[in-house]
């Protein structure tokens, strides 16, 4: 394939489609999507795969302690440094620190609290319909599911 053909195909795939147009292959610019988010702790869906959603979010400060009884949750740090505190996880209480390019999977049922001393930009992967504040817990940081950007 020539360089111009490759460039043309790349341009054809580099577009944004509405969620209703699933089934199309597309390039998603995570940096551009995150730039559309004004506040912190407001995850927004950028893609779906089967029953899983990929959500971008900006965070700063401490979130609340919460757990997801029925599902694991994946954190991928794109920029910044995130600490996740745990209570009674598989290894007991503790915390981990994730930097840009690192990820962690919090097992289902493990109580956790993400914390960031400065703004962190990250990608979350979790099943469709998961409430960001966990099982039964709601507060001012609880956001409506399935908000696409």
Q: What are the residue ranges of the model-derived segments?
A:
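A short, N-terminal "cap"/entry segment at the start of jelly-roll beta-barrel domains
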Residues: 1-55, 139-149
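Well-ordered beta-strand positions in beta-sheet-rich domains
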Residues: 56, 95-97, 113
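A cytosolic small-molecule/anion-sensing beta-strand core signal
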Residues: 50, 78-79, 99-100, 118
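Ligand-binding loop in jelly-roll beta-barrel domains
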Residues: 108-138
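Conserved short histidine dyad/triad with adjacent acidic residue
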Residues: 39-40, 53-69
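Short glycine/proline-enriched turns and hinge-like loops at secondary-structure junctions
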Residues: 68-70, 98, 116-118
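Short, conserved beta-strand element in jelly-roll/cupin
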Residues: 58-59, 68-88, 125
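Short acidic-glycine-tyrosine-enriched beta hairpin
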Residues: 88-108
């Amino acid at each position: 394939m020539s360089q111009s053909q490759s460039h043309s195909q790349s341009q054809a795939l580099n577009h944004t489609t509405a969620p209703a147009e699933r089934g199309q292959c597309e390039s998603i610019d995570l940096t551009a999507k995150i730039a559309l988010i004004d506040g912190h702790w407001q995850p927004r869906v950028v893609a779906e795969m089967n029953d899983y959603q990929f959500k971008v979010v900006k965070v700063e400060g401490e979130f609340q302690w919460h757990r997801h009884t029925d599902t694991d949750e994946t954190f991928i740090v794109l920029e910044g440094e995130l600490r996740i505190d745990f209570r009674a996880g598989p290894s007991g209480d503790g915390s981990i620190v994730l930097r840009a390019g690192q990820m962690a999977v919090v097992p289902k049922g493990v109580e956790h609290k993400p914390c960031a001393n400065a703004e962190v930009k990250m990608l979350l992967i979790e099943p469709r319909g998961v409430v960001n504040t966990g099982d039964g817990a709601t507060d001012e940081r609880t956001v409506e599911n399935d908000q696409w950007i």
